[in-house]
């Protein structure tokens, strides 16, 4: 093999190795940022992976909200009306967080079946429901409770 061909081959191999490394790094970064959505039924049935960041959503069960007296720790139960899952969260809940309304929690599922959330998202008005929660509730055969109409001020 003459020196020119050898040099070209070396450049092509180096370029392919560089492209392969770049693709590997990009895919690894994307994989870390993927948060799959799971319903309480899927979590209770063991379909959600342990110690992997997931999104869990459903309706907050009435009477399930427990706040710690001396910290920002909160514990509540989310349901899709078939099964329920407990979610713990340390921080200030969104202003629109209420029992009986839809939420999505981002966090990790531990071995006890509790989602340890680092972020809680609440619906932003009385008619909005996160798409994943709406689909999960529809698939479970139950619809989200209808929001009461807001009185319109006349005058």
Curated annotation (Swiss-Prot):
Similarity field: Belongs to the CcmE/CycJ family.
NCBIfam families xref list: PRK13254.1-1, PRK13254.1-3, PRK13254.1-5
Keyword Transcription belongs to the record: no
Biological function: Heme chaperone required for the biogenesis of c-type cytochromes. Transiently binds heme delivered by CcmC and transfers the heme to apo-cytochromes in a process facilitated by CcmF and CcmH.
Location of the protein in the cell: Cell inner membrane
Residues that, per the record, bind heme: 124, 128
Topological domains, Periplasmic: 30-155
Listed SUPFAM superfamilies: Heme chaperone CcmE
Membrane topology, from the record: Single-pass type II membrane protein
GO cellular component: plasma membrane
GO biological process, one term: cytochrome complex assembly
Keywords: Cell inner membrane, Cell membrane, Cytochrome c-type biogenesis, Heme, Iron, Membrane, Metal-binding, Signal-anchor, Transmembrane, Transmembrane helix
One family name in Pfam for this protein: CcmE
Transmembrane segments: 9-29
A GO MF label: metal ion binding
Spans within the Cytoplasmic topological domain: 1-8
Protein name as catalogued: Cytochrome c-type biogenesis protein CcmE
């Amino acid at each position: 093999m003459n020196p020119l061909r050898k040099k070209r081959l070396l450049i092509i191999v180096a370029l392919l190795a560089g492209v392969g490394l770049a693709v590997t790094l990009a895919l690894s970064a994307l994989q870390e940022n993927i948060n799959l959505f799971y319903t309480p039924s899927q979590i209770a049935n063991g379909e959600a992976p342990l110690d992997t960041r997931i999104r869990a959503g459903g309706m907050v069960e009435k009477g399930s909200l427990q706040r710690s007296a001396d910290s920002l720790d909160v514990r509540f139960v989310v349901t899709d009306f078939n099964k329920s899952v407990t979610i713990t969260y340390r921080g200030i809940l969104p202003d629109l967080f209420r029992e009986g309304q839809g939420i999505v929690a981002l966090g990790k599922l531990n071995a006890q079946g509790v989602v340890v959330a680092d972020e809680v998202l609440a619906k932003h008005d009385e008619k909005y429901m996160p798409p994943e929660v709406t689909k999960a509730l529809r698939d479970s055969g139950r619809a989200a409770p209808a929001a009461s109409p807001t009185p319109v001020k006349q005058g």
